Amino acid sequence: MSNYIEIKGARVNNLKNVDLKIPRNKLVVITGVSGSGKSSLAFDTLYAEGQRRYVESLSSYARQFLGRMNKPECDYIKGIPPAIAIEQKVISRNPRSTVGTTTEIYEYLRLLFARVGHTFSPISGNEVKKHTVEDVLAFVKTYSEGTKFVILAPLVPVEGRTEAEQLKMSLLQGYARIYYKGDFQRIDDVLETGEEITGEVYIVVDRLSVDLSTDGISRMMDSAETAFYEGRGECRLMFMPSMITYDFSTRFEADGIEFEVPNDNMFSFNSPVGACPECQGYGKVIGIDPSRVIPDSGKSVYDGCVACWNGAKLGEWREVFCRYAAKDNFPIFEPYYKLSEEHRSWLWHGLPSADPTDPYSTVCIDEFFEMVRQNQYKIQYRVMMARYRGKTDCPTCHGTRLKKEANYVKIAGRSITDLVQMPIVTLKEWFANIQLPEHDAAIAKRLLTEINNRLQFILDVGLGYLTLNRLSNTLSGGESQRINLTTSLGSSLVGSLYILDEPSIGLHSRDTERLINVLKQLRDIGNTVIVVEHDEEIMRAADYIIDVGPNAGRLGGEIVWQGETKNLPSAANSSSLIPNSSLSQSHTLKYLTGEDAIPLPKSRRPWNMKVEIKGARMNNLKGIDVAFPLNVMTVVTGVSGSGKSSLVKGILYPALKRHIGEVCDAPGEYGSIGGDIKAIQHVEFVDQNPIGKSTRSNPATYVKAYDAIRELYADQPLSNQMGFTAQYFSFNAEGGRCEECKGAGVITVEMQFMADLVLECEHCHGKRFKSDILEVRFHGKNISDVLDMTIDEAIEFFTQWEQLDIVKRLQPLQDVGLGYIRLGQSSSTLSGGENQRVKLAYFIGQEKIVPTMFIFDEPTTGLHFHDIKKLLESFNALISRGHTIVIIEHNLEVIKCADHIIDMGPDGGDRGGNVVAVGTPEMVSGCNEGFTAKYLREKLY
């Protein structure tokens, strides 16, 4: 097998006949500016070919389920192993999928509880045991040899027989004596009396003395087995002469309850055996939503925290509750979020002093909604019920998804539900300290190894704040990718090609080092790891770097530099530089060698106005007060899970939007919002969602440049002659578009059992328009030619012919580093980072926009150092127009350029949720708490 993956003549997208040799079993970073061709090389060439060859090696039966994969456009690729792509996308939309099921940790937990879990009675708390013949023998051995005892079996009449009839059958089977009414009696003597047999009757199966010889043990075991059979699973030992008895049962029962023997399906919420019967394993049902009943937990019961108890008439419920609550010392003036679980239970389910004979004393939230249900024949009560209904935790399983029997099974005092609700960092500590009995430890050894390894992998990629019951569809793209990475590590595949797309997204600098170790582990077990990445730490930790460029689009697609990382410092003079190329062409090497850098601002912008959030309590936020300065760039930092998104996306954005009268989802829990809110007239969350709901949406239509282009073509002489208006040059309206493909340029053929086929339209050949429309030209270019231009090409073309209005609308796209994308490129093909920057370009192009707060969530996703510089210039342009920028970010190049930093932490999950430091980068870097300061100091000084 070759030591290299050899690519010859790669021509996918903008790649320019690339020849490349990539070392196998190494950690390789592919880098370059946005649009340079990195993804074309990594995913559209390497992954596509590796996956295609693997699929072709399968049987024809297996291939029919996987669909046909096209061969990437290149001369040949040699030495490529089976490829696995781990991309930035949410891996599952299945509402049943969790972090535990995705990483397979939950499967091991199920097996662990099925094998070594011990069942405890919910009534007495005693362990429930199912006895065997061996248990009986072991107990007998505790007595000294020669001790006399009797093995008894309870008389269990067969259905339809009386006790007397059953005794006759026992007599026929060879049994002679019974234990009845406190004495041993012969069966025939009891039957001769003719009296009705009542009370407990035990058949004497055998009379023995403790004998530990082989024959003695064999006889004891045979007799015990017979007793279990005759007694329908029950057996009693009676020792002489004390008459002390001990009961044994092969039935799994205690306290009058028959329990289910633990098995792995019992702990599966995807199996009808283990799933809660009420919610079918989803954990949620449609019911009374606590967040709607108590929308503001900062209020007390007295102040009206229970929304349905407000108003002139319904307010009587609050008054009655407050009056009766005094008996139980319920704190009616305490904010709801400070109430103990016990006090919350009283409010919802009833006071402990409630008297069923006094209806007023039973007032509580449950009673209120019971009253509403009884009056639903009235429209106002039906409306009220609808107002407070929503998805809420299942009342039967309390959101655990499992039936109650699963929680009776415990290991070291914990049920499986307890474990999946722990943050992974806490769960890892619990497993590290677990003490099991010797027998259980031997059975669980392999399972514990797998669980501990997978938990450690999750910690290594910086996701220790997650819980195993966290839904997969609530994870960010970066979190999903890293969860997928840990799954790959846990599977221990070797000889594969792993291709990752920016695994450092959403990762604080503190966690990058641990991520690097994970990537190296993947390499060390015998895999080739290729990472498309811009993070400097990961680049320097790689074995080999491939720099694609030098620029984007048609100015990219070449290998500017490749070589071992150790050659980087002297790259300018290295013989490994590609001929006819130089260090000056590689933006990556310029930054890595210090020749170029993102400069620090000469000064930090001062501010005197702010928006202030008080008492933020959403998720893990600890009731914090935070001020966001206006007309400056504020960066919210902190490790993953520290509360950044909860503060900014969960509270600031919706609260501010509602305050200025715009429709928005309900914000998370907080006390109040104040400050200079009137200075903000609009708030915009610039996310990474597609710029349009339709695949027809493209950058030119989004920034309104296409309207001007259509007007230009409608003004051409041939258009005037033919009567073509601007509408004829739209692919969204009838007239000039190709009606065969409806202006899409492609036709989608739905396949019944395979992936849909997307074929070029045979009528317009992908041009989107009718032939007579394509005859209209502006300086030699028809409308289809213009849509195929990149932003850079279009600006150059329209500038040459003085179409300044079009240039003005396209210029912001170039300013934010998107000069390489095509005007007509479908929004569905843009990455999240590209979508975000198209939106940013739109706002930059708006001249008369009112004072706005722009909120960005990791805008540097997918950006090279060179592109970040352009992005910061765009931010400065918005601020200079009187706008405010708030950014959630981990990238130190952006953080060091902030005017104001809000550092959250100090850690993730329960250990986060506080404000660690605020102020300028210089002020924050001097803080000794949290993790941001340490890394920021290295960038500032």
Predicted segments with their positions:
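Conserved phosphate-binding elements of NTP-dependent enzyme cores
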Residues: 1-941
